[in-house]
Amino acid sequence: MSARLVEIENVYRSRYRSFLRVASAIVGDDDLARDAVHDGFVRVVVHRQRWRGDAPLEVWIWGIVVNEARRRGRRHDPRPISDTSSDDASSENGLGDPIRSLVAALPERQRLILFLRYYADLDYRSIADALGVSVGTVGATLNAAHSTLRTHLQEAQT
């Protein structure tokens, strides 16, 4: 097995749950999410020679898996991108449903960047590279998402 395939396998094994969680949030269905992650990794293996090395391999893989999930979501009339994970800590503190609703109401780009930042634990540069946007766009988009969520949470408390 080539060194590149070993690296891809290591990313798959170590980050599968993160990929699945983000894909599930994008497509709104666990089965479609598994298919998206699987097919995304198939694309990664088939097109591994296209990785130029200007970003970490995992970041390149994130871009492919996110694009596959978005493609599947469009094809299968998805629910809006949302936090569909039932094992989230927010469920335990009673905030899960209201927060899920608020996150689901955000524009798609804000939700996607929010999930890549907090579910996948990617830094701004990695998110920017994975989505093909600037670091400034990532920061501004996260700031807008935080601001909107903060405003809606404050309104809900009054």
Segments and roles (model prediction):
Residues 1-21, 34, 45, 111:
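A short, charge-rich alpha-helical start-of-domain segment used by transcription regulators
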Residues 7-10, 98-106:
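Short amphipathic alpha-helical boundary/capping segments
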Residues 16, 34, 38-45, 55-75, ...:
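Σ70-family region 2.3-2.4 aromatic/basic alpha-helix that recognizes the −10 promoter
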Residues 31, 125, 136:
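Residues within helix-turn-helix
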Residues 66, 70, 131-158:
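DNA-recognition helix of helix-turn-helix
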Residues 113-117:
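A short pre-motif secondary-structure segment
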